[in-house]
């Protein structure tokens, strides 16, 4: 698998992978991604800022991840929108993406990697813990919003 920066013309591929993963989560009862216009605009902006990466096998996009600096702490990178097209899940690709994020953090002089998961998504929380992330507890940014669990990993 190759991990490379997404280019503007790959936005539809990123959105497609996220939509398919969103459908899968909805089938599990996890309402997390909604693929709204805000998602489209946010992802487009993140691609322009070189924060979105594609997971590619044989020239086919099979996943995506966003890795960008935390607005409140420039020494922290935030991992979000980690999505692997369902037929490619359970093949050990997600740990490779997390390893890539860790290498990127080191290269950029970051000392912490952060991520959040919906409280209902036990498998993503387990993946993060298996890869050295520490559960920091739950958060609810605003009333009626999703409750998520924060995870952090110190980079040494």
Region spans (language model):
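Active-site acidic-Proline motif in GNAT/NAT acetyltransferases
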Residues: 85-87, 91, 120
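Conserved GNAT acetyl-CoA-binding A-motif
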Residues: 98, 105-117
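Short glycine-rich hinge loops at helix-strand junctions in the catalytic core
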Residues: 92, 109, 132
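Conserved catalytic-core motifs of GNAT/GCN5-like acyltransferases
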Residues: 116-118, 125, 129-149
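Acetyl-CoA-dependent GNAT
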Residues: 8-11, 16-87, 98-100, 104, ...
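Residues forming the Rossmann-fold NAD(P)(H) cofactor-binding site
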Residues: 95
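Short, surface-exposed alpha-helical segments at coil->helix boundaries
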Residues: 40, 122-125
């Amino acid at each position: 698998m190759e991990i490379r920066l997404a280019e503007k013309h790959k936005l539809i591929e990123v959105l497609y992978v996220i939509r398919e993963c969103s459908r899968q989560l909805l089938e599990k009862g996890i309402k997390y991604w909604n693929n709204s216009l805000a998602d489209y605009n946010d992802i487009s902006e993140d691609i322009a800022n070189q924060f979105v990466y594609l997971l590619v096998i044989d020239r086919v996009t099979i996943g995506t991840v966003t890795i960008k600096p935390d607005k409140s702490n420039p020494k922290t990178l935030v991992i979000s929108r980690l999505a692997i097209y369902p037929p490619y899940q359970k093949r050990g690709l997600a740990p490779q993406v997390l390893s890539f994020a860790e290498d990127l953090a080191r290269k950029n002089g970051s000392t912490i990697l952060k991520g959040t998961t919906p409280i209902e998504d036990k498998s993503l929380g387990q993946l993060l813990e298996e890869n050295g992330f520490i559960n920091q507890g739950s958060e609810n940014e605003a009333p009626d919003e999703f409750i998520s669990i924060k995870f952090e990993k110190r980079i040494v």
